[in-house]
């Protein structure tokens, strides 16, 4: 029995399902989860000592690779001064200033510890600001595990075939309206019917939790116009795509400004950190200035702030995003070419340093199209690549991530492995 199997059996005795986040359990793809012992650059090693090329990167944060020496040094410097204070620090101001500089729509920002906290707090703030209750979200978009957002969500819910989580009261779900992603007509119809009841529209401008699905410019521009017309707050959930698709995130890529933005992953540099921010007049409703309460014992934790601040500084290097985008595109295009050569129906897409793999005839644009992908074939591909030492997301409904340490040799090795995997699928 492998060490991974031993650890998984042991974990299941004290941890529900043996994992602390459902997708890690390999329930979708089958088999035994890999227990990580260490990581460096684009690689990690499992409990059996096997090396893998990592295309998850802790689900997005590791944009400069695992254990970047400058991030490590920044964390080591603050450790000796204390782990957590429950009081403000100068470093919190510095990371806030950096975020506001990089995302111009954010005039003020508040740090929290997770993406769920960020989206949950942003929605409460939008409701407090507008005095309205209804929120609009989109099918397949995942915004964390707050009750009102677990209605027809993506990520683990989609992976496990449960569109809405058990335990979400009907009285809460009734305030959430779910529309089809990228469907402008449905959006216009909803605003026409109850636009003046809508407190906020929350959207992943680049969805990464029903695999990678891009918001179309027409859809996102319609969102902006309708929210402005009806006085609703437009919330861009950029927890995943923020600092991933461009230095200024999806708002820079599309040239569209949100009222509130949720960030996470990259801004913690691998540590637990997230944030929400936006227009000053909206943020002024947060306690202690206003009546919308939000708090957190570990918000602005000095260790997380140190890792995040150094990461934000590193990604501003000249040419960083040009190189990262080109490398991610080379991976996606190369995988599609290998599949074509083997005669396997397959499509791939990338934007910035995010990519999507689809066992389908074309790149999907909606939740409905995503669910038509051949998940059985994906599962076989996943395990073939795992055997080759390449670690993709263990679900057909999750995006992948490339770091600045995924150099040509790493991409070449991945494509060579994929050539063998696609050949086996076609046999």
From Swiss-Prot:
N6-(pyridoxal phosphate)lysine found at: 265
GO cellular component: cytoplasm
Cofactor(s) recorded in Swiss-Prot or TrEMBL: pyridoxal 5'-phosphate
Domain of life: Bacteria
HAMAP family, alphabetized: HemL_aminotrans_3
UniProt-recorded name of the protein: Glutamate-1-semialdehyde 2,1-aminomutase
InterPro entries: 4pyrrol_synth_GluAld_NH2Trfase (IPR004639), Aminotrans_3 (IPR005814), Aminotrans_3_PPA_site (IPR049704), PyrdxlP-dep_Trfase (IPR015424), PyrdxlP-dep_Trfase_major (IPR015421), PyrdxlP-dep_Trfase_small (IPR015422)
UniProt organism field: Burkholderia ambifaria (strain MC40-6)
GO MF, any single term: pyridoxal phosphate binding
One Pfam entry name: Aminotran_3
Keyword list, A-Z: Cytoplasm, Isomerase, Porphyrin biosynthesis, Pyridoxal phosphate
Main location: cytoplasm
S-S bridge residues: none
Family classification: Belongs to the class-III pyridoxal-phosphate-dependent aminotransferase family. HemL subfamily.
Biological processes annotated in GO: protoporphyrinogen IX biosynthetic process
Localization (cell): Cytoplasm
Known catalytic reactions: (S)-4-amino-5-oxopentanoate = 5-aminolevulinate
Quaternary structure and interacting proteins, as annotated: Homodimer.
């Amino acid at each position: 029995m492998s060490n991974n199997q031993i650890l998984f059996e042991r974990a299941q005795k004290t941890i529900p399902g043996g994992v602390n986040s459902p997708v890690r359990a390999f329930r979708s793809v089958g088999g035994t989860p890999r227990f990580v012992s260490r990581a460096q650059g684009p690689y990690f090693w499992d409990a059996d000592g096997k090396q893998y090329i990592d295309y998850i990167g802790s689900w997005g944060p590791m944009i400069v690779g695992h254990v970047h020496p400058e991030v490590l040094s920044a964390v080591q410097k603050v450790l000796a001064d204390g782990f957590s204070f429950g009081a403000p620090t100068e470093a919190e101001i510095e990371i806030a200033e950096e975020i506001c500089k990089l995302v111009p729509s954010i005039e003020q920002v508040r740090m929290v510890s997770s993406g769920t906290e960020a989206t949950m707090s942003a929605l409460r703030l939008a409701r407090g600001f507008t005095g309205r209750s209804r929120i609009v979200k989109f099918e397949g978009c995942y915004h964390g595990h707050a009750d009102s957002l677990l209605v027809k969500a993506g990520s683990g819910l989609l992976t496990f075939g449960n569109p809405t989580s058990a335990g979400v009261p009907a009285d809460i779900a009734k305030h959430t309206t779910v529309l089809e992603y990228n469907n402008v007509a449905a959006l216009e119809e909803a605003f026409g019917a109850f636009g003046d009841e809508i407190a906020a529209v929350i959207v992943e401008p680049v969805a990464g939790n029903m695999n990678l699905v891009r918001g179309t410019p027409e859809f996102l521009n319609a969102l902006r116009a309708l929210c402005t017309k009806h006085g609703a707050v437009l919330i861009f959930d950029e927890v995943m795509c923020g600092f991933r698709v461009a230095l200024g995130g999806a708002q820079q890529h599309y040239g569209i400004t949100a009222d509130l933005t949720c960030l996470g992953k990259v801004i913690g540099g691998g540590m637990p950190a997230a944030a929400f921010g936006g227009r000053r007049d909206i943020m002024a409703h947060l306690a202690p200035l206003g009546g919308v309460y939000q708090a957190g014992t570990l918000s602005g934790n000095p260790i997380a702030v140190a890792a995040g601040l150094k990461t934000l500084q590193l990604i501003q290097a000249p040419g960083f995003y040009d190189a990262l985008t080109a490398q991610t595109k080379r991976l996606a295009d190369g995988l599609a070419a290998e599949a074509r050569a083997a005669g396997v129906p397959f499509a791939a897409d990338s934007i910035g340093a995010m990519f999507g793999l689809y066992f389908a005839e074309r790149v999907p644009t909606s939740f409905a199209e995503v669910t038509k992908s051949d998940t059985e074939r994906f599962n076989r591909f996943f395990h073939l690549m795992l055997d080759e030492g390449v670690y993709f997301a263990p679900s057909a409904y999750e995006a992948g991530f490339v770091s600045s340490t995924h150099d040509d040799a790493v991409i070449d090795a991945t494509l060579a492995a994929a050539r063998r995997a696609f050949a086996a699928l076609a046999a």
